[in-house]
Each structure stands twice: as structure tokens, then as C-alpha cells.
């Protein structure tokens, strides 16, 4: 069937421009030809799983290590950059990573991105000063930008579509686990060794990933081109000009959210710096969208994606669910350590209900989706149980009994059982335009991680806005004492209170408890938004789509054979 004649239910996203037809000749391999089995498959999946875990853990782990890092470098002036550098580069380069995967061999691109991540980790580990550490974090973030989208692309190549729900579910469970355990692992390494091992740890684990991919992954054949791309054509295909609008927009928005706030932050919300960053982000985004419209099918972010309901729903659902879960993953360990007085080891044990349920729900839901072919009911389930679990945690108090917080965690852990659904939805929507899948997956991943960064920044602002007035009005602290609490960090709350006035410990813990409980409303709201977005996913069987893919692949092979005989 000629590429220019193809259409589908999803509308404009499924159309292939005739201009591309003479330059590219589809490869004749069937969709299943790159599938792996046995030891090679398991080895590749283990390597990819390690890469996902390390990349997600690096995003979540820094908070508990910051006090030790600032002590080593003898400065607190760059604390904001410690946390901002990684998500800034990861989010801003995410869409470009998708374009690179679409233009170059998957294996090579993944190895380069993951190599960048490991290089950044090494720079952080050996950093001798604050600027070197920040450069390392930015480098690692740039590498991480291509890790998750590359993982999803590789899984789609080595695992049939109807089996991907189970595999992607288990993979994404590692992301959720890393978000929860990242601060705990960081605390353990910092307490028992040095904060540098938070980054050195990535090197031997990352070596396993590199070996697995180099030895066992056979990348799918790429379409052959009748004429090679020139440098100007490649620049146009990668839409590097679009990057000049997109990257500043993301950087300025995240910096505004990182720096903006009252009291504990570098700039007030109404300061010229923060207002300027928000305005600059808005202008850059508008210019970027105008350019993307002009670029058409070569755009880094094809605007026709936003005419497809499945892709829109996938982006928004990933934004809401992972963003809401990251808030829980960040503040739940804080609640255990501040309110319950747990050390990092005990906190890790107390988080096990969340982690274990996370894995079990992924496996169970993955098997059910694999059998039935439909993931839609579980979209509602995931959003609903996260909303219920987080909503119940808004009632936290210092004496909340063990059975209660275990039950809340079980609900929240079960929520991530369907976090892989947005990526499955994209693959179904673009089943007849596989060359666009890496770009669309990068868009979904961007929304997931950008949502996580946005939600975490907002949650920290909510926490500070509830904490500071509470310490003054309820605990009777002076502004100078409040600043001491903010500077000391959450791990030193009990020790600092013992120095200031031990008799106020109970009231101080209540203030911290109320601030953390208040933050859980953000997670609840995000989950409820995700529940509403679930209505936007069309009901389409993954099994039926897999059979359709096989049939089309067989027809393509037959056409190629006939053409070869006639030639």
C-alpha cells in the first residue's frame, strides 16, 4: 500500500507525507524479527531495568545528601543548582532525544546517552568543587534524557506488543521504586560511607547495562535511503532550530519554580527575576510553537500529535499520575524520619508496603492486560487508588498507627501498576507510523518527568508555606529560629529542637506533620485529574493490534519478494 494513501482512525497522526516516500524504503523485516527469547532477552531486560532505576534514583536521591555535599564544598550558595541541574537538562533535551532515536540506530544512540549519564555520575563522584559537581549533574541529566525513551523503544523492538504490558509494567515499577527508595539509599550511603558513593554506585551497575546491550541487543533494521541526508537536511530533520526555542522555555520555567518562593527560596514570587523567568518561558514557548507549525512533519514536536486524543491523554495521564506519586515518594520518607523518628534503615523497611505492592500490582495488571488485551479499566483503578491513598494521608497525625500508614502505602503502590499505559496507548495510536513512535514516546516521557519536576517544586513550596507560619504561630519560634530549621534540613528537626527548647518538640512535630499532610492534597488532586483523563483513552485491544501488525508485516514482506522477482 503506498505510504501516501495510508489513513487510520486516529486522523492526521496516521498520515505519511508523500514527500518522504521517494527518499526512504521501508525495511522488509517483520515486526517480530528483532524479538529476543531466553537468556539474551532476560539479560537485555535486566540491563534496561538497571538503567531505568539508576536514572530515576538520581532524580530523587539528592535531598538527603545535600547537607554533606555543602559541607564538603563549604558553600550553600549553589544548593538550588544541585537540585535543578539534573531535571533541567533531562527535561529540556527529552524531545530532541526522541528525534535522535528516530534518525539514528537505537543501539548506538542508547549507548551514547547512557555513557553520558555515567560520565556525569563520575564527574559528580570525583568533584572537587561546587561548579564541577553542577556540571556533572547537568551531564548526567542530559544522558538520562535518552535512557527512558531508549528503553521503551528497545522493549518495543525485542518484545511483541501484546506482551509489552507485563514487561513495561515491571520496568516502570523500577521507576516508582527508585523514586521511593532513592532518598533512603542516599541517606544510607551518606551515613555509612560518603555522599560520593551515591554517584559511584552508578558506574558498576551501569557497566552491566552496557555489556548487556552490546552483547545481546540486535537493533531493528532501519529504512534504507536512496540518497544520504546532507548536513542541512539532518539539521532540519533533528529540528535543532526548534531546540533553541524549546530548551530555554523549559529551563526558565523550571528555574522559576526552583528559585521562586518566600523566605527559604532565593527570590520572592513577585520579584523581577521570577516574573522575568516566567515571561521569558512564555515567549520562548510561543516562538517554539510557531516554528514547529512551520516545520510540519520535521518538527521536533509534531503539532499534529495534539490532534490525536490518545496521545493527548497519554501525556496528561503520565503527567498527573507520576507527578502525584513523586510527591508521595519524596515526603513519605520525610514523615517517617521526622515524625516517627526513623533512621534511614528503618525508613526503608517502613516503605516496603509501597515497594512490594508496586511490584505485585505491575505483575498482576500486566498479566491481566496481556490476557484480555485491554488496559483501559486499570487507568481508572490506578488514578482512583492513588487519590484514595493520598487523600487518607491528608489526615496524618503524629500518632497515626502502623496499620493505617501501611494500608495507605498499599493503595499508593497499587496505583503505579498501570503507569506503563500511556506508552502502550502511544504505540497503538501510531501502529501504522512506527517511525514516529520514538518521538511520541519522548513526548510522553517528557510530560512524565516534567510533571514530576513541576509537582515536586509546587509541593516544596506548599510545604514551606505551611511550615514557616506554623512554626511561628503554633510553636512560638522567632523568624531567626525558623531560618535555623530551614537551613538545618528535615533530618535535623529533633536535634535542633532539643537545642532550642526540648519542651516544644511535640508542637514542632505537629507543625511538620500538618505541613506534610497538607502537601498530600496536591497528590490527591493530581490523581483525580488523572482519573478524568482516563476517559480520553479509546478502547482498543492490544491483541487485535498485534495481529494487525503481523498481517501488515507479512504483506510488506510479500510485496518486497514480488518486487524482487519482477526486478
Swiss-Prot record:
> What terms describe the molecular function in GO for this protein?
transmembrane transporter activity
Query: Which stretches does UniProt call biased (Basic and acidic residues)?
Result: 1-23
Pfam families named among the record's database cross-references: MFS_1
Its main subcellular localisation, reduced to a broad class, is membrane
GO CC annotations, alphabetized: plasma membrane
Q: Which gene encodes it?
A: poxA
Transmembrane intervals: 35-55, 77-97, 108-128, 141-161, 165-185, 197-217, 240-260, 271-291, 311-331, 349-369, 372-392, 410-430, 436-456, 515-535
Compartment(s) of residence: Cell membrane
This chain belongs to the protein called MFS-type transporter poxA
What family does this belong to? Belongs to the major facilitator superfamily. TCR/Tet family.
Give the membrane topology: Multi-pass membrane protein
Positions annotated as glycosylated: 370
**Superkingdom of the source species:** Eukaryota
Q: What is the lineage of its organism?
A: Eukaryota, Fungi, Dikarya, Ascomycota, Pezizomycotina
UniProt KW Transcription regulation keyword: no
Write down the PROSITE patterns for this protein, in alphabetical order.
MFS
The job of this chain, per UniProt, is described as:
MFS-type transporter; part of the gene cluster that mediates the biosynthesis of oxaleimides, cytotoxic compounds containing an unusual disubstituted succinimide moiety.
Q: For the region Disordered, what residue ranges are annotated?
A: 1-24, 547-567
| Induction or repression | Expression is positively regulated by the oxaleimides biosynthesis cluster-specific transcription factor poxB.
